Amino acid sequence: MEIVWEVLFLLQANFIVCISAQQNSPKIHEGWWAYKEVVQGSFVPVPSFWGLVNSAWNLCSVGKRQSPVNIETSHMIFDPFLTPLRINTGGRKVSGTMYNTGRHVSLRLDKEHLVNISGGPMTYSHRLEEIRLHFGSEDSQGSEHLLNGQAFSGEVQLIHYNHELYTNVTEAAKSPNGLVVVSIFIKVSDSSNPFLNRMLNRDTITRITYKNDAYLLQGLNIEELYPETSSFITYDGSMTIPPCYETANWIIMNKPVYITRMQMHSLRLLSQNQPSQIFLSMSDNFRPVQSLNNRCIRTNINFSLQGKDCPNNRAQKLQYRVNEWLLK
């Protein structure tokens, strides 16, 4: 009955319904990309050009397993072999440095504080490397992934690498079974997620107003970032920034987390430039959705358990439509 309750809750929250440029040296253009059309009045490649300006980024244009995507709930299939996620912090709180990268708010954990994740669709254990925030200039946009065509105000992405097979995230990002990204949608509310509250309170967020600003955070409990649900959606995709390697397994949690309107306003006041340059808000730092190309969208939400408690039989119908879609 727990799964039934979650699905019905998300129905009310509108979250889940019952469930040719010149080719130059890669090194020259390593950081030469942007999300928006204009950066200080000069041309910097926006997402539609990422794969054209750098031969090492060609997957951004020609890849068939790119991210983010629009999750159509009618295309989800229940996978009984998806186990619950297991987060191992060693029973300790962690420290990390929060950065304004000019494109994201990024939190990188100190190397002595290891947080591993396993279970779900994973065969191997993966180690948390970075937490990244995407958010919009308006509440109606900001997330990279969409749900039935709907965007959320933001998206938290926890980027993990396969530490059993690879020595670091750089090596893993280029390799099979290299990355797992846990994605959590953000909504604006009167209350705030405890973990995000630590990151976004005024005393903290104002320390990283400009590009390259950094601030140390201590005593963080990673488990507080996760919403109270064991349900998720998963698919095979890519990183959403150049070079768009198709080595990421995405796990999208079935409930959002919340931040206050003031905290969202503080995010929108972050600059993608340095103090000596013109102010340009970091907001709208998301890549447009990419074609699904018949990839399978799996979930551990068992629609068939809803029975008579569900106000309609849409979930049961979804199962049959999913099966037909996969056979096409």
UniProtKB/Swiss-Prot annotation:
| GO MF terms, alphabetically ordered | carbonate dehydratase activity; hydro-lyase activity; zinc ion binding
Q: Which InterPro entries match?
A: Alpha_CARP_X/XI (IPR041878), CA_dom (IPR001148), CA_dom_sf (IPR036398), Carbonic_anhydrase_a-class (IPR023561)
Origin, by domain of life? Eukaryota
- Enumerate the spans annotated as Alpha-carbonic anhydrase domain: 31-301
Function statement: Does not have a catalytic activity.
| Similarity annotation | Belongs to the alpha-carbonic anhydrase family.
Q: What is this protein called?
A: Carbonic anhydrase-related protein 10
Which organism's genome codes for this protein? Answer: Bos taurus
What gene codes for this chain?
CA10
